[in-house]
A protein has these predicted regions:
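Aromatic pocket-lining residues of Rossmann-like dinucleotide-binding sites
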Residues: 40
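Conserved beta-strand-loop-beta-strand element in the redox core of flavoprotein oxidoreductases
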Residues: 133-152
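Sec/Tat signal peptide C-region and signal peptidase I cleavage site
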Residues: 14-18
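N-terminal Rossmann-fold NAD(P) dinucleotide-binding loop
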Residues: 33
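Beta1/beta-strand and adjacent pyrophosphate-binding region of the FAD-binding site
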Residues: 19-30
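Conserved N-terminal/central alpha/beta ligand/cofactor-binding core
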Residues: 45-46, 51-138, 176, 184-186, ...
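Sec-dependent N-terminal signal peptides
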Residues: 4-13
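Flavin (FAD/FMN)-binding glycine-rich loop and adjacent Rossmann-like elements that form
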Residues: 143, 151-157, 161-557
């Protein structure tokens, strides 16, 4: 009898583990995933956040500390709350400077976890969507999703906040990858670029050696005709955090499968640039360093040959998990080898090499991943094709939207897409554009979050949202992801309240609640000041003591 009771209890427990029901199921622990889950939970929804690996915050806690803010005055809502909390962590309110736009990764992740805990969100890590068969639908509604460990999650509303858009894709939502042609939507920034002046080789480097062998890291495929569409993806890299504080510094690691031939083009580039400039390249000309607190810097790509691994990510968006893991490892090996080469190869100018050796990985960041970032910078992967597709004009001329849920302002920014052999036989990069002057603060429409009605009616997509490559190049910044996630969480509550498809959410109610929570729909310092007033009411000022962390200058009130 006792055995029978225990057997029944075991079956009940196993069943409970195998199937869980929630109002809101959020897939992907990116910063957008956190804000989506927090917003929904604060609205009273029973919410779960599923993260495929074991960190939350995505790039914001994974190395992208040098936040791409554009015009700071457009950032509001839960995104602003995150940077406000970071400011409180660093004590910046004591110096009439409340927002920390560049928090250290470990600080960012701690804040995100705190927000999730306070809101009562169930966070389940190492819950990756089962490949190919992870989504069950009935008609246009997702009924449940299944993770690799066999757990099934039923929900009323689902939100895909992953960088890859796997939940979206398995739900049979229309999407695209790569670049549209200039003709498709009338976009001057679309398609293959005729000229790529930025992050280019300033000197001519033959693409082939004397015996005709193509240099490593150069593609032999043709560039393509300017303005035509292709399936190529802008380059990925890791946003590495480095320090020049000796007590906290670990020397640049040498990858196990280091191959010096991989950097032959870099060696030639460095050698040719010295006579061209009349001096060796500086560390800031092969890496973009952005100072963050406590003696650290966020390192990004800069120049013709840098940390971007150009042309090696084309199979990532639609790749299976094993393909993506291979590409991820390849990027890590390449970038570690790039830093090792600069710090150790005898062909590197001594001045540049000495600068590189002043820096290394910090002991106090990414301690469970060898002090290397836990997140690859997936700048772009799948992009949903919804009933409304944001295009270049939505950044430049068609700025006002009746269904606005957030604002963007960052310049149109695409990294290089390919490295090829030009008509004269020299190495050339293609695909980068940096367009800021003609991009004005603009509304982001709720419609970019919603799939086509005939496909899915209970899914929202705040990261792989509906936009062209040109529009996505501006809208893809982490503060915007966070604000779109905030809107998705509230929209989920409204859809559940009204028993309505996500396409029919009451926009007036959505905007009213967002504004009450500090969202910004107009550009100007006074509107962010109103949002900050809301935050100050929620958070008591901490004790005023101690100096500011290194990297934040003293800022005192004007007298």
């Amino acid at each position: 009898m006792i055995r029978k009771i225990w057997f029944v209890f075991f079956l009940a427990a196993a069943s409970s583990f195998a199937q869980q029901s929630y109002d809101l199921v959020v897939y992907g622990g990116s910063a957008a995933g956190v804000t989506t889950a927090v917003a929904g939970a604060r609205q009273g929804l029973k919410t779960v956040l599923l993260e495929p690996r074991d960190h939350v915050g995505g790039l914001v806690s994974g190395g992208l500390s040098g936040t791409d803010v554009g015009k700071r005055e457009v950032i509001g809502g839960l995104a602003l709350e995150f940077y406000f909390r970071a400011g409180r962590h660093y004590g910046l309110n004591r110096h009439h400077q409340e927002l920390a736009w560049m928090p250290e990764p470990k600080v960012a992740e701690a804040i995100f976890r705190e927000m999730l805990k306070e809101a009562g969100v169930t966070l389940l890590e190492r819950h990756r969507l089962r490949e190919k068969t992870g989504v069950r639908k009935e008609g246009t509604r997702i009924i449940e999703i299944t993770t690799e460990n066999g757990t099934r999650f039923q929900g009323k509303i689902f939100v895909d906040t992953s960088y890859e858009g796997d939940l979206m894709a398995q739900s049979k939502v229309s999407y695209t990858t790569g670049r549209e042609s200039t003709a498709q939507y009338g976009e001057s920034l679309a398609g293959v670029r005729a000229l790529t002046p930025s992050h280019q080789f300033a000197v001519e480097i033959p693409a082939r050696t004397a015996d005709g062998t193509l240099l490593p890291e150069v593609s032999g495929a043709p560039r393509g005709e300017p303005g035509t569409a292709d399936q190529r993806i802008q380059a990925y890299n890791f946003r590495v955090i480095a320090t020049n504080v000796a007590a906290n510094r670990i020397p640049w690691p040498k990858p196990d499968n280091y191959d010096v031939k991989r950097y032959e083009l870099l060696a030639i580039y460095l050698t040719k640039m010295t006579p061209y400039l009349g001096r060796p390249l500086d560390i800031n000309e092969v890496n973009l360093l952005r100072v963050i607190p406590n003696g650290k810097a966020d390192w990004n790509n800069r120049g013709g040959f840098s940390s971007d691994y150009i042309g090696k990510n084309y199979d990532y968006p639609d790749g299976d998990y094993s393909t993506r893991a291979r590409i991820w490892r390849d990027h890590e090996d390449y970038q570690k080898g790039f830093y090792w080469f600069l710090a150790n190869d005898p062909r590197v100018p001594t001045e540049l090499q000495a600068q590189m050796r002043e820096w290394g990985l910090p002991k106090d960041e990414f301690v469970d991943t060898g002090h290397w970032p836990h997140q690859l910078y997936i700048r772009e992967a799948r992009r949903m094709v919804g009933p409304f597709v944001a295009t270049q004009k939505d950044l430049q001329t068609d700025l006002v939207k009746p269904d606005a849920i957030a604002m963007g302002s960052y310049g149109a920014d695409s990294h290089n897409v390919q490295r090829f052999v030009n008509d004269r036989g020299f190495v050339e990069n293609e695909g980068d554009f940096q367009v800021s002057a003609s991009v004005n603060p603009y509304h982001i429409a709720y419609r970019v979050l919603t799939p086509q009605r005939e496909e899915v009616t209970n899914l929202l997509v705040p990261v792989c949202f509906s936009a062209t490559h040109a529009a996505y190049s501006s809208m893809r910044m982490e503060p915007q992801y966070m604000m779109l996630g905030h809107a998705a969480g509230i929209a989920a509550q409204l859809a559940i309240r009204d028993h309505a498809p996500v396409q029919d959410v009451q926009i007036v109610d959505l905007q009213r609640q967002l504004k009450a929570e500090g969202a910004i729909f107009q550009y100007g310092p006074e509107f962010q000041a109103q949002a900050l007033t809301i935050l100050r009411r929620r958070f008591a000022a901490p004790p005023r003591q101690g100096p500011l962390p290194w990297g934040y200058p003293e800022k005192r009130a004007a007298k």
